[in-house]
Amino acid sequence: MTTSQRTAAILVAAGRGLRAGAGGPKQYRTIGGRTVIHRALAAFAEHPEVAVVQPVVNPDDIDVFNAAVAGLRHEAPARGGATRQASVLAGLEALVPHKPEIVLIHDAARPFVTPAVISRAIIAANKTGAAIPVAPVTDTIKEVGASGDITATPERAKLRIAQTPQTFRFDTILEAHRRAAREGLTEFTDDAAIAEWAGLTVATFEGDVANMKLTTPEDFVREEARLAASLGDIRTGTGYDVHAFGEGDHVWLCGLRVPHTKGFLAHSDGDVGLHALVDAILGALADGDIGSHFPPSDMKWKGASSDQFLKYAIERVAARGGRVANLEVTMICERPKIGPLRDQMRARIAEISGVDISRIAVKATTSERLGFTGREEGIAATASATIRLPWGA
């Protein structure tokens, strides 16, 4: 049996996380263009040595969870409990049929865990049976009494910041959690504490100072700034598309079904606005064009809705650790009139792409009755996309 077949991961995502503000659980907030939970889950789902990824979520969050992690590999979510400890036990019980030898337990609120930390966790578990990642303490720590006066100054050299994923042999941590539940002990703050209580020796391995837990609004502000600073490779791409009119009573423009006296002659739905945007994004990535990814010779795309093309292009940006800074599309036509639909089109592009509407522009012009657009034989669109990538992505 290979290491990957023996290793499972639990992603604990059932907390409400209200201290982070924004009116909802912090794991579903967006940071750097992706949800916190998508970043955390992807780290394990994309790791070659992790065979099973078991999320644990609040029952009220199933729909938002599924939307946030669409496309990522994971098991059906286990139902979270009233405490983190109960949620971890639910995740462990859900893994029993998989019979893993090693389990990594990770908090969804730590979205910046790296493949290197995950690999070190697996090595540590196989070597010691129980281990946690730690980071050095750089500040001086004080113990304070009820009066607010300092009572002691711990020796900093002996202190470490505990992180996740905390990693264990599956059978031993499962039994420790079951035993704690039977005895009504519910106040353990992490899995290492349960392991210590159960008599296990818990080793440590090198964590990562960037693997921090997002807790407060200030944490989100700081990490957004850090991510933005890391995306220094700024790229711009342009796109162009045109479709002739044919028979019909509507056209698709920027994701909207627009009534018209004609329709488009096209392999897909003919949405020139979205097609131009897709080409602009792919151009910024130096990743071909819409025809190379969705060839018109492939009947799979016959009549296809163009929103899936735009989603795909956005996913290509995210896959390289980037984010979209701006999208702009200009429609060139006499009719239908774009002005009254401008804000609806911006909103629809934002909905499809996940890009904030403040970063989306829709414009329109005519060709002054010149050329095929002036003769109302079709519609053209030009687009530009500005994206930010990490250097070397």
UniProtKB/Swiss-Prot annotation:
Q: Which domain of life is it from?
A: Bacteria
Q: What is its EC number?
A: 2.7.7.60, 4.6.1.12
What keywords were assigned to this record? Isoprene biosynthesis, Lyase, Metal-binding, Multifunctional enzyme, Nucleotidyltransferase, Transferase
Q: In which pathway does it act?
A: Isoprenoid biosynthesis; isopentenyl diphosphate biosynthesis via DXP pathway; isopentenyl diphosphate from 1-deoxy-D-xylulose 5-phosphate: step 2/6; Isoprenoid biosynthesis; isopentenyl diphosphate biosynthesis via DXP pathway; isopentenyl diphosphate from 1-deoxy-D-xylulose 5-phosphate: step 4/6
What InterPro entries is this protein classified in? Answer: IspD (IPR001228), IspD/F (IPR026596), IspD/TarI (IPR034683), ISPD_synthase_CS (IPR018294), MECDP_synthase (IPR003526), MECDP_synthase_CS (IPR020555), MECDP_synthase_sf (IPR036571), Nucleotide-diphossugar_trans (IPR029044)
- Record-annotated site: Transition state stabilizer: 19, 26, 267, 366
Designated name of the protein: Bifunctional enzyme IspD/IspF
